[in-house]
C-alpha cells in the first residue's frame, strides 16, 4: 500500500513539473492572504482547528459558546476518529439478519445488506445496524455566559483563521468587556489549547451530551441527562480528569490550566472553570483511555502546532494565481488553499473520513468508501502522500471482511463496503 501511494505521488509530481526557471512562490504570502476573516455572526462561517484525527469547530468567540445558533448551519463539533457509541441491542440483532438474496442475472443468488420496508426482525436489524455505531460529539467547550445571553450581544468581532500557523485569533466585545482568544489544536494529540485575556473573568464550560443517533445533525441530545454519567476522577489546583460514560462506551477528558482558577460541577454533565485573573490558559485533551502521559502545556501545544503547519505549507506542491488576469483567479486560489487545510484537518486520519469530516455527523458519522477519491486522492497530487498513507492501513485491516463479502456474493477478490464504520460492521 505504501509503495503504491508513493508511486502515484511521484507520477503526479513528474507530470506537474514545469519550467525550472519559474520564480519561487512566496508560500507564506500565498497562504496568509487566503486566511479567512470573520467580522460578524454567520452560522455558515464557523472555523475549525484539527489534525486529521480530531477537530474542534468554534463560533465567533473562538470557543463553542453559542452552539444552538450554529445547529442549522455548520455545527460546532468536537469529533475524533475513535469516538464512537452504540445504543443497546437487547434483542441481539445480528448482521446476518440484514441480508437479502438478489438475482441480477449472473447465474447465482447474491446476498446484500438491505433496508427492509416490511416490519419485523429483519427491519429492526437493518435499522439498528444502520444507526450503530454512530460518531460521538465529545463535548462542548465554550464561555459560560449568563442564561439568556444572545449571540447578537457579541460585537466588534474580528476573527482570523491563521492558516500558516494553524491557529484561530478572536477579538470581540460582550456586555462591554473586551475578549482576546487564541485557539489551537495539538498536531498529534486530540487536544485543544486556548489563551484567553479578559477582565470579565468569564468561566469556561465543559458540557457533555448524549448522542442522538440521528442521520445528520450535531449529535447532541441534551435532554437524556440520566442515560449517561460524567464524573471527576481526579482534581488538583491546576488540573482535573473527567470520565464520560455512555452505556458501554467511556472516554476521558483531561483539563489543565495556568493561572488561578477553580473547577466546579454546575449541573449534570456541566462543569465550569472560573478564572480569578484577567488571563487564563488551558488545555483540554480527549482520550479513549485513562491518561497515562505527562500533560502538554499551552505553550508547547502552540509551538508544536505552529511548527507542524509551517512545515505543512512549506512542503508539497503550491499554486499561486496572483499574476493571473482572469477575474475568477482570486476566488479559485482561495478555494485551492483553503481546501488543502480543510482536508488535512478533516480527512487525513487513520480511517476514511465521513462526508462532513470531523465537524458534524452525516450518515450517523459513518463513511462511504466511494467518496475517498474526493477526500484523499488529492494528497498524492499535492505530494503529501504521508497523509494519504495514514488511511491506507485501514484497508489492509478490513481486507479479510471485504473478501468475505465478495465470497458471500460469489465473486473473486474483495468487495469494499459502501457505508461503514471503523470495525467495518
Feature map (PLM): residue ranges:
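Sec-dependent signal peptide recognition
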Residues: 2-7
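C-terminal motif of bacterial Sec signal peptides marking the signal peptidase cleavage site
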Residues: 15-16
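Carbohydrate-binding/catalytic loop surfaces
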Residues: 356-366, 411-425
Amino acid at each position: 500500500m505504501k509503495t503504491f501511494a508513493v508511486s502515484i505521488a511521484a507520477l503526479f509530481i513528474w507530470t506537474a513539473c514545469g519550467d525550472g526557471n519559474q520564480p519561487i512562490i512566496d508560500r507564506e504570502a500565498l497562504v496568509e492572504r487566503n486566511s479567512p476573516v470573520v467580522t460578524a455572526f454567520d452560522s455558515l462561517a464557523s472555523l475549525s482547528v484539527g489534525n486529521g484525527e480530531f477537530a474542534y469547530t468554534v463560533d465567533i468567540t473562538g470557543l463553542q459558546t453559542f452552539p444552538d445558533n450554529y445547529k442549522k448551519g455548520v455545527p460546532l463539533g468536537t469529533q475524533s476518529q475513535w469516538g464512537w457509541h452504540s445504543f443497546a441491542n437487547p434483542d441481539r440483532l445480528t448482521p446476518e439478519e440484514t441480508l437479502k438474496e438478489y438475482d441480477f442475472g449472473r447465474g447465482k443468488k447474491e446476498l446484500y445488506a438491505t433496508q427492509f420496508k416490511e416490519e419485523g426482525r429483519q427491519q429492526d436489524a437493518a435499522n439498528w445496524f444502520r444507526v450503530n455505531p454512530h460518531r460521538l460529539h465529545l463535548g462542548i467547550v465554550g464561555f459560560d455566559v449568563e442564561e439568556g445571553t444572545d449571540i447578537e450581544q457579541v460585537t466588534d468581532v474580528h476573527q482570523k483563521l491563521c492558516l500558516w500557523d494553524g491557529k484561530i485569533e478572536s477579538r470581540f466585545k460582550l456586555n462591554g468587556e473586551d475578549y482576546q482568544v487564541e485557539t489551537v489544536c495539538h498536531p498529534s494529540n486530540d487536544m485543544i489549547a486556548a489563551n484567553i485575556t479578559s477582565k470579565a473573568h468569564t468561566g469556561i464550560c465543559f458540557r457533555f451530551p448524549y448522542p442522538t443517533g440521528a442521520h445528520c445533525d450535531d449529535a447532541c441530545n441534551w435532554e437524556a441527562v440520566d442515560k449517561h454519567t460524567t464524573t471527576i476522577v481526579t482534581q488538583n489546583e491546576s488540573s482535573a480528569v473527567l470520565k464520560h460514560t455512555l452505556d458501554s462506551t467511556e472516554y476521558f477528558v483531561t483539563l489543565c490550566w495556568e493561572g488561578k482558577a477553580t473547577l466546579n460541577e454546575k449541573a449534570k454533565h456541566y462543569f465550569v472553570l472560573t478564572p480569578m485573573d484577567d488571563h487564563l490558559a488551558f488545555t483540554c485533551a480527549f482520550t479513549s483511555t485513562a491518561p497515562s502521559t505527562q500533560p502538554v502545556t499551552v505553550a508547547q501545544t502552540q509551538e508544536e502546532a505552529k511548527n507542524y503547519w509551517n512545515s505543512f505549507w512549506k512542503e508539497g506542491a503550491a499554486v499561486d494565481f496572483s499574476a493571473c488576469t482572469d477575474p475568477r483567479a482570486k476566488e479559485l486560489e482561495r478555494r485551492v488553499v483553503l481546501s488543502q487545510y480543510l482536508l488535512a484537518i478533516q480527512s487525513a486520519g487513520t480511517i476514511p473520513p465521513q462526508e462532513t469530516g470531523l465537524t458534524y455527523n452525516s450518515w450517523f458519522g459513518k463513511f462511504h468508501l466511494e467518496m475517498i477519491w474526493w477526500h484523499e486522492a488529492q494528497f498524492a497530487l499535492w505530494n503529501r502522500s504521508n497523509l494519504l498513507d495514514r488511511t491506507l492501513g485501514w484497508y489492509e485491516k478490513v481486507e479479510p471482511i471485504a473478501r468475505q463479502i465478495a465470497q458471500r456474493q460469489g465473486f473473486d477478490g474483495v468487495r469494499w463496503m459502501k457505508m461503514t464504520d471503523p470495525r467495518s460492521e
